[in-house]
Each structure stands twice: as structure tokens, then as C-alpha cells.
Amino acid sequence: FERLSILGADALVEALDRIEAGEAEFEPQDESRVTLAPKLRKSDGVLDFSENSAAVERHVRAMPTWPGARTTLPGGRDLVVLEARPVSPGSLGNEDVAASPGTLLDEAPFPVRTGDGAVRLGRVKPAGKAAMDGEAFLRGARGARGDTLGT
């Protein structure tokens, strides 16, 4: 991301300089090479904790607005995940490694078991509420070790 933002900024400055100098050559887009992305559905945002930690984290980053990376809490309430970070597999205990994907491994700082390790849910947005820190959410929701998300 950082590297691309620098390259993009440089390309933008170069393009603006060429336009200002009257040297820019405008070329219409070749419509035969157009590709279209399918419309996103709410179901496209559903997190699959059986995926590896990197895939879960990428899914969260890919869905920042609509449809949002989402899972369900015990009881069926929706939880939108706004930030997730992989947890080092070496930091998992034997009991954590044996847990099934989607299992809450501890009350804080909100680690959830994935297919190959765990992710820490940093910011979340419960249905009908404002976004908040994952740990603050767990304190209020009384989340407990062993609860399973996404069921």
C-alpha cells in the first residue's frame, strides 16, 4: 500500500505537469477491453474463520464499507469487523490450537481462532451501535472464552 501510494502520487504529479504544459495525449478507453466487477451482496462480507489468518485479515480490509466484513455472535446478532490483525501462531497455547475456527480464545484482546492460527479483532461495530474497540465490546457483551462466532 505504502509503495503504491508513493508511485501513484508521482504519476499524478507527472500527469498534471504534462497537462499544464500541453503535452498530454488523451486516448479514449478501448471499450472491448472493459471488465466489470460483479455487484457485491451482503453475503459477500461474511467472514470464514476456517480460512488462514492472512485471508481473514485481507477480507476485513477489502470490505470497509459495503457489505462490511461480518460475522454473527452467539444468539445470532450481527457483528461487523472493521479491523483484524493476524496473531503469531507461536503465541497460541495447546488448548487454543485444538479450538475450532471462529472460537473466541480469550476475553481480551479479542483473539479468534482461524484455520491456521488466530486474528485479533481490533475494532468492531455491533448491529445498531457505534464502532468500538474489540475489547470494550467484549466487556459489554460479556463474551467468554470458548464462544463461537459465525454460527
Regions found by a protein language model. Name each.
Residues 1-25:
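Conserved anion/nucleotide-ligand pocket segment
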Residues 25-30, 125:
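Glutamine-centric residue-chemistry signal
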Residues 28-47:
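Flexible, acidic loop-helix segments that line cofactor/substrate-binding pockets
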